[in-house]
């Protein structure tokens, strides 16, 4: 028996998966309801959610953090689910962890650059 257990990187990915799942279950539906349904129906008074106000929010520090969380966390959750679904279906992608988590990392960097240049 090995007395020195090997360190695992899985808690990092499970943490991002859990955070993305919670974000996707609690925050994302509310934002989609506000922006995709209620805003076009005119449920908000006047310029409450005008383009200029939304752009100003998105260009503020808290708005940029919100956009990053809104995109990156569900992205990690989804790619983690796909990685484990492929494993459950006995479809073994060579270096699957590198493929799926690498793609999530690359897309996170692209999102970060995109949000910073907003």
UniProtKB/Swiss-Prot annotation:
InterPro entries: Fumarate_red_D, SQR/QFR_C/D. It comes from the Bacteria. Its main location: membrane. CDD domains: QFR_TypeD_subunitD. GO terms for biological process: fumarate metabolic process. The chain crosses the membrane at residues 24-44, 54-74, 98-118. It is found in: Cell inner membrane. One of its GO terms (cellular component) is plasma membrane. It is a multi-pass membrane protein. Pfam families: Fumarate_red_D. GO terms for molecular function: succinate dehydrogenase activity. Signal peptide: none annotated. Keywords: Cell inner membrane, Cell membrane, Membrane, Transmembrane, Transmembrane helix. Two distinct, membrane-bound, FAD-containing enzymes are responsible for the catalysis of fumarate and succinate interconversion; fumarate reductase is used in anaerobic growth, and succinate dehydrogenase is used in aerobic growth. Anchors the catalytic components of the fumarate reductase complex to the cell inner membrane, binds quinones. Belongs to the FrdD family. Part of an enzyme complex containing four subunits: a flavoprotein (FrdA), an iron-sulfur protein (FrdB), and two hydrophobic anchor proteins (FrdC and FrdD). This is Fumarate reductase subunit D. It comes from Yersinia pestis.
């Amino acid at each position: 028996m090995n007395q020195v257990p090997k360190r695992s990187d899985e808690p990092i990915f499970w943490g991002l998966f859990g955070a993305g799942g919670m974000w996707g279950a609690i925050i994302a539906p509310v934002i989609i309801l506000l922006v995709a349904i209620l805003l076009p129906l005119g449920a908000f008074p006047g310029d409450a959610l005008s383009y200029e106000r939304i752009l100003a929010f998105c260009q503020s520090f808290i708005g940029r953090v919100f956009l990053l969380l809104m995109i990156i966390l569900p992205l990690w959750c989804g790619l983690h689910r796909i990685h484990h679904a492929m494993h459950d279906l006995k479809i073994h992608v060579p270096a699957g962890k590198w493929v799926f988590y690498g793609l999530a990392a690359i897309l996170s960097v692209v999102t970060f650059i995109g949000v910073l240049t907003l």
